[in-house]
Amino acid sequence: MPRLIFLGPPGAGKGTQAERLAAIYHTPKISTGDLLRAEVKAQTPLGCQAKVYMDAGELVPDEVLIGMVKGQLQQSPEQGWILDGFPRTLAQAEALEELLQELGQDYDYVLNLEVPDEVVVARLLARGKEQGRSDDADRSVILKRLEVYRQQTAPLIDFYEAKGRLQRVNGNQPMESVQEHLQALLEGFRRTA
């Protein structure tokens, strides 16, 4: 079963593609964004704390996310997993490497969905209207999220490229085309593994 990490700016389609691959391969999708939004919706103490960061377009503290991810990775390791929205910083990537080593797990690919900023902004504004997500409804918050992505998440591209695990994917095309590309990539990996 595949073990994948999705990277890319907000609005690149990571969640959509992760969900599609999870359904095809019967693999759990682990989305820190979904986990955090559930906490916010339930108005738990963690959710209220996280909402402040999310509404400002900032990242939720590492220790919160790492603990959540560890719990998810331990549930059914034989089914594989697809990480969506984690890691987002070099510190998180290094912590994930340590965590996977501790759990005796590894990942197959890091899939970086590449999408131009103007497309990201348009996608997120549309999603904000459709889904009522406060972190997607305000252009200034979206621009802040892109700035945070460039500063904190984009360095992961070099980190994973140096490990020979990064696959760049054009996310600025129809969803079906992106999915077909990802499936072909995974099928090629399964044949050589």
Curated annotation (Swiss-Prot):
Q: Which reaction does it catalyse?
A: AMP + ATP = 2 ADP
Q: In which pathway does it act?
A: Purine metabolism; AMP biosynthesis via salvage pathway; AMP from ADP: step 1/1
Where in this chain does the entry annotate a coiled-coil region? none
Q: Does the keyword ATP-binding apply?
A: yes
GO BP terms, alphabetized? AMP salvage
Specify where the region named LID lies, as residue ranges.
126-136
List the subcellular locations: Cytoplasm
User: Is the Transmembrane keyword given for this protein?
Assistant: no
Binding-site list for ATP: 11-16, 127, 173
* EC number in record: 2.7.4.3
- Known SUPFAM superfamilies for this protein? P-loop containing nucleoside triphosphate hydrolases
* Chain segments carrying region NMP: 31-60
Any one of the GO CC terms: cytoplasm
User: Which UniProt keywords are given for this protein, alphabetically ordered?
Assistant: ATP-binding, Cytoplasm, Kinase, Nucleotide biosynthesis, Nucleotide-binding, Transferase
Describe, as the record does, how this protein assembles with itself and its partners: Monomer.
UniProt free text on domains: Consists of three domains, a large central CORE domain and two small peripheral domains, NMPbind and LID, which undergo movements during catalysis. The LID domain closes over the site of phosphoryl transfer upon ATP binding. Assembling and dissambling the active center during each catalytic cycle provides an effective means to prevent ATP hydrolysis.
Family per similarity comment: Belongs to the adenylate kinase family.
Under HAMAP family, the record lists: Adenylate_kinase_Adk
Full protein name = Adenylate kinase
Organism the protein comes from: Synechococcus sp. (strain JA-2-3B'a(2-13))
